[in-house]
């Protein structure tokens, strides 16, 4: 009888231990999931706000460009806007990705996708880009205004930020800087890493 009682006691302790470990594991999982959802929600809201704000700026710049043709005035306006908002570059952009800056610099803005289709729909665009020898950037593109600047025919205007600046904005103190950040499209393509 004492052996059966000890065996029963051991089985009860083992059963309670398994239930307790299961309970603790589930609690930790729920807390971790809740915290991660909170962090991701915060980052998502900050990214949405950044996109909304920068596309609004682009629409304001378009209004200015529609009413002004003086190159010096345009350059002064864009330089002041750059100081106020902190974007890296402002581009007059053609449908094929070629650009001209307000200072007259030309080149190809290495975009991840074909602009032609999106510009023809008149949609605002946010996409990853890179210039030779420079870090990756996030470009905000607005096709609202078409025109010519210094003889360069453009189909849209764009501003860009270096990805590290965008990630600093999105960085949360939740992981004390020990996390990797990715911004992805719904189809899984990485926008910022």
Where on the chain are the PLM-derived regions?
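Short, hydrophobic-rich beta-strand element in sensory/regulatory alpha-beta domains
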Residues: 58, 87-93, 179-182
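Extreme N-terminal signal-anchor transmembrane helix of membrane signaling/transducer proteins, especially
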Residues: 1-26, 30
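Solvent-exposed, extracytoplasmic
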Residues: 71-85, 156-193
